[in-house]
Amino acid sequence: MRKIIIAGNWKMYKTQAESLDFLKALLPKIADDHEEREVVLCTPFTDLGLMSKSLHGTRVRLGAQNIHWADEGAFTGEISGSMLTEMGVRYVIVGHSERRQYFGETDETVNQRLKAAQRHGLTPILCVGESKAQRDAGETEAVIFAQLEQDLVDIDQNNLVVAYEPIWAIGTGDTCDATEANRVIGLIREKLTNKNVTIQYGGSVKPNNVDEIMAQPEIDGALVGGASLEAESFARLVNYV
């Protein structure tokens, strides 16, 4: 049975005060009849402690946006798995395209971060996807398959979420056609040894397209950026029809 996971990635948004205001608005709007859907908020590191306390006893799980592969050490600006688990974090995003593009993360370091997450009992959300140039060149499958092959070396697929995020659709307002997203996610599933891995779609998921996206048979959830920053829009995604 594949788990449905709707995860918000707040990126570098929301102070602690803003996070509390968001939760106060969100929690009453999440329908109780959708308890089989896992709801995750991946917040900035500065929000994790407060959010952990505030989310206790709710159906929302706490996620982080990155993890270092070392358990400790002289790695200025990084955060370890034990630091995250101490905060009550359950999920962690690994290999987001913004990390790969702006901070030089490679498939090798993504693999190391995945291993660190699993070593500490965290469920990693592995992001894979192609650029506009790669899609236009007909390289979508080759790019994604290469990422999967390198990223998943010695990774336990029983504790893994994959997010297909076409880079050209992130924050642009351009959404990958739902049927095309379903096709690509189906190809990703074929490459996995565990066919029950939750595979999300990420890329301009909004209240006006979430129903069509989630109606696709291969899509098990969404990794949401901008639409997760407003309580009303994120609640609409969680409560998709």
From Swiss-Prot:
Top-level enzyme category: isomerase
Pathway: Carbohydrate biosynthesis; gluconeogenesis; Carbohydrate degradation; glycolysis; D-glyceraldehyde 3-phosphate from glycerone phosphate: step 1/1
Keywords: Cytoplasm, Gluconeogenesis, Glycolysis, Isomerase
Catalytic reaction annotation: D-glyceraldehyde 3-phosphate = dihydroxyacetone phosphate
Location in the cell: Cytoplasm
Keyword Acetylation among record annotations: no
Residues noted as binding substrate in the record, renumbered to the chain: N9, W10, K11, G171, S204, G225, G226
GO molecular-function terms, A-Z: triose-phosphate isomerase activity
Domain of life from the UniProt record: Bacteria
Annotated catalytic residues: H96, E165
Enzyme Commission designation: 5.3.1.1
Chief localisation class: cytoplasm
GO cellular component terms attached to this protein's record: cytosol
InterPro entries xref list: Aldolase_TIM (IPR013785), TIM_sf (IPR035990), TrioseP_Isoase_bac/euk (IPR022896), Triosephosphate_isomerase (IPR000652), Triosephosphate_isomerase_AS (IPR020861)
GO terms of biological process kind: gluconeogenesis; glyceraldehyde-3-phosphate biosynthetic process; glycerol catabolic process; glycolytic process
Subunit structure: Homodimer.
Family listed: Belongs to the triosephosphate isomerase family.
HAMAP family: TIM_B (MF_00147_B)
Biological function: Involved in the gluconeogenesis. Catalyzes stereospecifically the conversion of dihydroxyacetone phosphate (DHAP) to D-glyceraldehyde-3-phosphate (G3P).
Name of the molecule in the record: Triosephosphate isomerase
Organism name: Picosynechococcus sp. (strain ATCC 27264 / PCC 7002 / PR-6)
